[in-house]
Amino acid sequence: FVFPFEKYDQKILKEAKKRPIRHLMINTNGIKLAQDKDFVRQLAEFKPGLEIYLQFDSLDDDVLLQIRAAKLAEIHNRALENLNYYDISTTLVTTLVKNVNDHQIGDILEFAAKQSCVRGVTFQPLELAGRVSSFGLENRITLSEVRRKICEQSNLFTLQDIIPVPCNPDALAMGYG
């Protein structure tokens, strides 16, 4: 069960926990998690079975300004401090934009490996739809390029470790490290 963090309401989580829903995932940019440690404590009451899906496009504010039009590096760091403190399962979610943040894949993986709450990193290639207007086709990155860059920028994986998912091998791949 997934819902956007902006719509967060403890009643939703309480109702979901009463049902046969084993895993709750909250999508967030991390702002509230960074600003309100007590709020993170309240979220921790829903463990196990709660996961934070944290927008995490870069470690660099200059890059974040290009992608999100906001300086979010310190926000993300504070959010992760709070999530680490309460050991809330977290996935970092990186929208990859070719020639903007694709050179930081290795840095993001290394950073994630140092966070006790982080259970995974999801790299999502830029989708040219909706609000995306400042990027073009030259900023699209393919799954093959992502796999290659992971291996080039980090010693955590080899190409053999990152395997295409059979149900959609052109769009999905996974690796465990």
Regions found by a protein language model. Name each.
Residues Y85-G177:
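Radical SAM enzyme [4Fe-4S]-AdoMet core and its adjacent flexible, acidic
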